[in-house]
Amino acid sequence: MDQPQIILTEPGRFITSRGTLPDPAPEEARIRIRRIGVCGTDIHAFHGRQPFFEYPRILGHELGAEVVSINGDSHLKPGEVVAVEPYLNDANSPASQKGKSNCCESLRVLGVHCDGGMRPEINVPIRKLHRAASATMDQLALVEMLCIGQHAVNRSLVSFPETALVLGTGPIGLSVITFLKGQTKRIVVA
């Protein structure tokens, strides 16, 4: 499928071009991108300050999407609204088998290590799509960032009557503050 795409060719330079999207591989789905969040990672890549990044790259890992087609068995159907888990890991790796997919040696992040969603459609593993019928596309573009905040709070083990310190009030810091409310007596923000 031929489609337009936005490519960050080098720090500070985007271009639009056309690219070909292959048919979905087995156990992949084609999704239509409806919303894209702009992340701090994207901004750092634009300014040339993202150490895990190679140019050229199609950015976009905070995505709200709709299923177009599926190549394999799935609980999802074309037309369904989905949240996209942008961390592409080997499900059979030792780290993934232990529930630590973020430590998988072959981990790739959409829009960082491989091309992401700044184009109309992409193919992703079916297992990385999560049905989200009650969410808006705008909300879905925030899911990945909110998950990072929730994960940070879960790992912190903070609880009443402890005080929590949050360093920074960017989007992730704000999500941490949101998830800490009701879980700790006091939140200090610096």
Q: How should each PLM-predicted stretch be described?
A:
Residues 1-4:
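Extreme N-terminal starter segment of soluble prokaryotic enzymes
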Residues 9, 20-21, 54-60, 110-114:
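Short Gly/Pro-enriched turn/cap motifs at secondary-structure boundaries
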Residues 16, 64-66, 121-123, 129, ...:
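Conserved hydrophobic/aromatic beta-strand scaffold that supports enzyme active sites
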Residues 22-36, 49-92, 133-135:
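Glycine-rich beta-strand-centered segment in the early N-terminal region that forms part
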Residues 41-43:
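Cytochrome P450 core scaffold surrounding the K-helix E-X-X-R motif
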Residues 76, 85-133:
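Cysteine-cluster motifs in flexible loop/terminal segments that predominantly coordinate metals
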Residues 135-190:
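Mid-domain Rossmann-like dinucleotide-binding core that forms the NAD(H)/NADP(H) cofactor-binding site
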